[in-house]
Amino acid sequence: MQITKQLWSKAVTKAPLLPLPTKTKVSLAYKLHMPNKTVTPNLTIRSHEPIVFLHGVFGSKKNYGDICQTIANTTHTPVYAIDFRNHGESEHCFPLVNYSQLSKDVVDFCEEHDLKRVSIVGYSLGAKVGLLTMLKHPKLVNSGVIIGNAPIETPQVKVYLKVFLKAMTALIDSAHIKATDKNWREKARAVMSKYIPDASIVQYLLRNVLNKKSSHIPGHTDLISVQMPISHFNKDVIDDISDWPAEEVKGLKFEGPVKVVKGLKSAFITKEGEKAYAEHFPNYTMSTFNTNHLIFAEMPSRVTKTVCDFIKLTRYQLLQQHTRDGKHHTIQKVDPALLNSSEASTVEQATKQL
């Protein structure tokens, strides 16, 4: 990933700011993706183990709508795509980006919506939040697919985050693009491209740009705005995003199945990261793709298939385990339509024993 390095200033934006409240509990915005009835018209077995999709930094549920719907259709499972605090349509408040708080927000969301034994799919920032949630709340999580990150500090991400913030704050401080300008999006793209030559990253970040009044900067009544409160994002936030609460999870393990997806051209999952996976997630497996960090953007179909295949296979294996153990009350029954003919026959026989 080639980007232009810029000097970092203490003041992220020159614009005056509206104050943000401090909250330990927020109601997260979300999009519920239900399996398409045209895909599964005769589906009678509903999943009691929903999927919670956690997006990356500067992203939102909007970035992954098609992917989440495909996962829902393929796994016959409801997918809850959430917006983290200070992202997408969720509330702006302090703490801005803190892993312990973000994980608590996910747990609160699951409790609010009565979600139990969830499968977590987390990308980048969402990957670390998902990992922390699995370690601290293992009874809540059934399995996880973790994409493009590891349970360690990742200082290498800081240079990218600084440039991304520079590009977006340039839209606020100096671009002066009118919200009524019919070419506002292309003009915003041109401004950001001066800082970030990678078109796929610019496209990703443009999802934050709106042709409406800013919610956190007074006086921006007729200009385009950035949906996130990035004007409050300073060096401390950059440090928080690259951090990992190692002391908080010392000695903790998640024994459930975990699939790690790694981009071979990305520096996010190092040998140290793989060692940390082995320490905390003894039942993890890894799939690699010849991509950079934006794995979903570069190979959306292949990565989505990996997610779906893992979730389906995991449920099949857990059903077998529960059957062998004689456990009947918490079984997630598997629709044979999800599996190949051999697996479906095995599941059918196992289900008769429940």
From Swiss-Prot:
Keyword Ribosomal protein among UniProt keywords = no
User: What EC number(s) does this enzyme carry?
Assistant: 2.3.1.-
Which PANTHER family does UniProt cross-reference here?
A: PROTEIN ABHD11 (PTHR46118:SF4)
Record family assignment: Belongs to the AB hydrolase superfamily.
Tell me the Gene3D superfamilies matching this sequence: alpha/beta hydrolase (3.40.50.1820)
Q: Which Pfam families match?
A: Abhydrolase_1
Q: Which residues form a coiled coil?
A: none
Active site per database record: 124, 293
GO molecular function list: hydrolase activity; transferase activity
Protein's organism = Cyberlindnera jadinii (strain ATCC 18201 / CBS 1600 / BCRC 20928 / JCM 3617 / NBRC 0987 / NRRL Y-1542) (Torula yeast)
Database matches in InterPro entries: AB_hydrolase_1, AB_hydrolase_fold
Q: Which UniProt keywords apply?
A: Hydrolase, Transferase
The protein depicted here goes by the name Probable alcohol acetyltransferase
